[in-house]
Design a protein with these regions (language model features):
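Structured soluble/peripheral alpha/beta segments that form catalytic or ligand/cofactor-binding pockets
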Residues: 1-377
Length: 377
């Protein structure tokens, strides 16, 4: 899990010079962070306030950083071949949609979790699902407005499911794997929501083919209305090449999430309905998340040992499309306060609800003026 905050974003002068920059003014906590939650819920964090060695692609999911270069060699400022990375980087990482490589050393600043001193890895990834039907144009995760700097934060599932092959060295052990299930997403903006939950699973029992579930919800700020928030959630499932998306502007989405240990969601649209129930007996691991007033802070709790039951049903015929379970579900709660269970249904305010029902190709809109094209599009 990588995070970076540009020190210029908190500056009014620099922010206002960027397209849509006035939406991002506020406090600044510059730095680059890399976190790993590994086997046995152990943890590693490396963080550096110097962001000058960070590089990232403006319109692709490609990024990297050098915490410590080898000797006097200059750090890479873009993707390099694997051997060149080894020759030039002592501690750092590089990530693209198909390649992930790095070495991290824990900085010793975590007193609430059992940490691992060092981790190394190299693996390639073959994407299976993006966010949409296989072979079709892919979608924005939360509707076309999510492609613009409107909501806080902005969320895009880049690869709902993929297969990775390579190795990871963690806590003194080397793990080699072939076609291991993988997932990647990006978040951008100033901070995570005030409160949120997340469910993700790519490993299921009793079903043929690749299945990928991603669901989440949060209390997020409304654009250009300081102090106003809405509670929204969505469910997305890829199965047998088809994408089943459940969003509150096309139907109903409800959830009942406990402070820890139980995640329940149900959603309906005109043609399908989905139900999912997840539980977790393990205590999980506390991770850091971007916040508006504290920077990267320990604000969320995760586990990869969740038990999940997932069903999709055709509403008109009653036919069961998918009925499956898993004992390797990723579960998360974050932000707060979490005094008790969070039980509610999604409510998208107007005029956003009506706007999201339109199908707009944002990339095509910006093609005549590429200099205004938002990052990540």
């Amino acid at each position: 899990m990588y995070s970076v905050e540009d020190p210029s974003v908190g500056s009014n002068s620099s922010a206002s010079s960027l397209p849509f920059g006035e939406l991002f003014q506020g406090m600044s906590f510059p730095g680059v962070g890399a976190q790993i939650m590994g086997a046995d819920d152990k943890y590693l964090l490396q963080f550096d306030e110097n962001v000058t060695k960070f590089w990232g692609s403006r319109h692709e999911l490609a990024l990297g950083y050098t915490f410590t270069p080898k000797g006097r060699v200059s750090p890479p400022m873009g993707e390099v071949n694997p051997q060149e990375f080894v020759n030039r980087v002592e501690e750092g990482f590089q990530v693209t949609p198909t390649w992930h490589q790095g070495c991290l050393r824990d900085n010793g600043k975590t007193d609430y979790a059992e940490t691992v001193p060092i981790a190394r890895w190299e693996y390639s990834t073959r994407p299976i699902y993006g966010w949409g039907d296989s072979g079709a144009e892919q979608k924005s995760t939360a509707g076309w407005l999510a492609a613009l700097p409107v909501f806080e934060p902005h969320w895009q599932v880049c690869m709902a499911g993929g297969l990775s092959t390579g190795w990871i060295e963690w806590d003194g052990q080397r793990y080699e794997f072939e076609d291991a299930p993988s997932y990647s997403e990006k978040n951008w903006g100033g901070s995570f929501p005030l409160k949120w939950f997340w469910i993700q699973c790519n490993v299921f029992e009793g079903v043929s083919g690749e299945v990928a579930l991603t669901a989440g919800g949060g209390r997020r700020g409304l654009p250009l209305v300081p102090g106003a928030y809405e509670e929204v959630a969505m469910v997305g499932i890829h199965y047998d090449g088809k994408f089943y998306e459940f969003v509150p502007w096309e139907g109903s989405v409800e959830w009942d999430i406990s402070t820890w240990g139980s995640w329940k969601m149900s959603a309906k649209r005109d043609d399908y309905e989905v139900n999912l129930e997840a539980t977790c007996d393990s205590p999980g691991c506390t991770l850091r998340a971007p916040t508006a007033d504290l920077g990267l802070a320990p604000m969320c709790r995760d586990s990869f040992f969740g038990k999940l039951k997932l069903t999709i049903r055709n509403r008109s015929s009653g036919k069961m499309i998918l009925d499956t379970t898993s004992d390797m579900c990723a579960l998360e709660v974050g932000g707060g306060p979490w005094y008790n269970s969070w039980k509610t249904s999604a409510r998208v305010q107007e005029p956003l609800k009506s706007l999201l029902r339109y199908s707009i190709d944002v990339e095509r809109v910006f093609s005549p003026v590429p200099q205004l094209k938002p990052p990540g599009l």
